[in-house]
Amino acid sequence: MAATPYQTGFIAWKSSKGEFKEWELNGTRLAPDGQLVIDPSAAAFETDPMPFMEGGISFYNGGAFRVGEAISPVITSPFPLDELVPSWNADTPTGAWLEVGLRVRVGERWTGWYNLGVWAADTTTISRHSVSDQTDADASVSTDTLILQSNSDTQAFQMRLRLFSADGVQTPAVRMASVAFSSPRPITPELKPGNPRYWNKHILVQECSQMIYPDGGNVWCSPTSLAMVFGYWGWNAGREERVRTSVAGVYDHIYQGHGNWSFNAAYAGARGFDAYVLRVTSLAELEPWIAADVPVVVSFGWREGQLSGAAIPSSNGHLAVLVGFDSAGNPIINDPAAPSDDGVCRTYDRREWETLFLSRAGGTVYIIHKPGWLPAA
């Protein structure tokens, strides 16, 4: 029997297209530009349920706040769901933050809401964090990903955004929300041929090594990849400033790391980019982005001996930047695990790398670009 093909889906709502009008609003409203904000006249008054958590942080702000919520329409997947990863782009001024939830319909029954993160762009008011210890008979949360226990009868979901204001005046302003969803990751993925007309192209993205920073750089692959992309799109700060600022901007105080996919996309969004987590079924799906001059942050993992020319012997989960394809279609990747900046750009064998990209990370990428910059059809 042939293996079931890997399937992925994506849904997004953008304020620029008026798409939050589809959401159910309770204590929130739409600003004139379509962004989702708190409605001070209708928001509830609440206090932090866990002001003293392990590690010296609070679940929210440690005190009182106003909160409203917005719930998406029911989204039906064309295939049984296995994993879901949310993204959002929002401004969160000091005194404002947001919380992201997902729930899934199992048969005719809805699960409870799973918490996929409490977010603000800085730590003046809250300590941004994922939420651990969320496992039940229906699903579990692994930092940034909702994982279903069984995908046999789960083909619908909803997203919830809760918006918070410490003073009832400052408000988050959400301009985009999205969910990437997928079927079970393929153990032995079916590799699809690419299109040679997209090959033999290399986007020049300044190389940045994570390994030159002795104070934690060995685990900074994701923010270092962001730093490379930010430099490409015009942030003219030096390499180290871009890296260290990104490291601070994506840190998850519960996960105690920098690899939260959703937080990385949210941080890029906070810097003014269109940014979201996407899952694809093949490397070929990324070729049009390279053709459109959009470098793509890619996730993959490998055991020792699985990736020829790898910058380090192995990794359970790693992020790097796809910057092009050589004349044979092999991916050209700025790999921050290189020991120095000048060794970051590498070309990996397409079959080897794509297999690891799909089987170990489910084809997960960050799409980050200037607003409105899209590949040609």
What are the functions of these language-model segments?
Residues 12, 162-258, 310, 327:
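Active-site-adjacent structural segments surrounding the nucleophilic cysteine of cysteine proteases
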Residues 10-59, 63, 76-79, 95, ...:
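Noncatalytic regulatory segments and standalone regulatory/sensor domains
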Residues 62-63, 72, 240-376:
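Conserved active-site-adjacent core of cysteine acyl-enzyme catalytic domains
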Residues 111-152:
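Extracellular carbohydrate recognition and processing domains
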Residues 1-3:
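N-terminal export leaders
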Residues 64-87:
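Contiguous beta-strand segments within globular domains
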Residues 79-93, 161, 302:
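A short beta-strand element within beta-rich, extracytoplasmic domains
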Residues 96, 221, 318:
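Histidine-centered active-site/metal-ligand motif
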